[in-house]
Amino acid sequence: TLYNKLIELLKKGKQMDKSKEKCAPENMVLSDTERWKNIDRHKAEDYVRKLQARIVKAQREGRHGKVKSLQWLLTHSFYGRYLAVVRVTTNKGKNTAGVDHVRWSSDAAKVKAIDTLKRRGYQPMPLRRVEIPKKNGKKRPLGIPTMKDRAMQALYLMALDPIAETTGDQHSYGFRKYRSCQDAITQCHDVLSRDVAPKWILEGDIKGCFDHISHEWLLNNIPMDKEVLRKWLKSGYVFNGSLFPTEEGTPQGGIISPTLANMTLDGLQSLVQNAVKPYWKPADTEYGRIRIKPKINLVRYADDFIVTAKDKETIENVILPLIRQFMAERGLVLSEEKTKITHISEGFDFLGFNIR
């Protein structure tokens, strides 16, 4: 049964974990600080990396039961929990506390934190909401989880990220390893600098993407522990001393939120490209009769995206209706004010660059 397989995998994981701390002299009792320093980080990273590779392999083979088993093994492993604590105590937000005002600043606190990262009985605390000023004078809400909740998100992200990278859109560049804003701009130039390049651009703008993603869609479609995900989504937030519920969206500030947003928008590229296949036009060439593609390309960086097309009518009559439907299924809408159709001769702004 699946339960027996999980137990067998856990036993194997414990066998691999048994040498997680460097050997100390017999009968010697280590302090918490010494225990933290004695953990072999390279061995931990190697253990997690191998599990992630197995998750990728199982995902590609369509073995979803195996994927779940491996995810469970990773999120319950000592090494996975250790690396989650390492991440939240070494990143930029390590000195920023949540609503409980707790920081894991000492090695002793870190090693004790490892044992607290358990699914059983886990209940996340509300986010501490702050507002960050934007260049346009408006404010962007930022939800700050507690250290423990950040570490739990980091832990489960290790098990989710291999799937996100395996199934992600080819030309999605935001919040992904080894990809950058510059890669997205390079792809735009590659598409638009060809001799027969498309001339029309749809500049897509999603209204409050992170704040409005449907919880129901996330729970039905994100391949991770549903109970843990539900608790994060429904944890609420504290602002000006008052507690507010969260009925939609994934908070900006959570470690796992960018990946959840990316996975929500994955599939958009294939949707628009496949939608125009019926509109491919036959043409006679010196090589024989071929079908001319309508030059549809999508480039996305997080929730910012552009779509290219040969003519304006294709965007208006085919692409835009499909994108609106895609967004509506996920609880999202395009901003009518900021979503524009532009001819390449006019140029367009994307990720801080003007392309023409």
Locations of the language-model features?
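Short alpha-helix boundary/capping elements
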Residues: 75-82, 93, 160, 164, ...
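Nucleotide/phosphate-binding loop and acidic/charged catalytic motifs
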Residues: 156
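Amphipathic alpha-helical blocks
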Residues: 105-124
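Conserved polymerase palm-domain catalytic core
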Residues: 116, 120, 135, 167-171, ...
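Non-catalytic, polymerase-adjacent accessory regions of viral genome-replication enzymes
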Residues: 1-111
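Conserved phosphate-binding loops in nucleotide/dinucleotide-binding enzymes
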Residues: 141-143
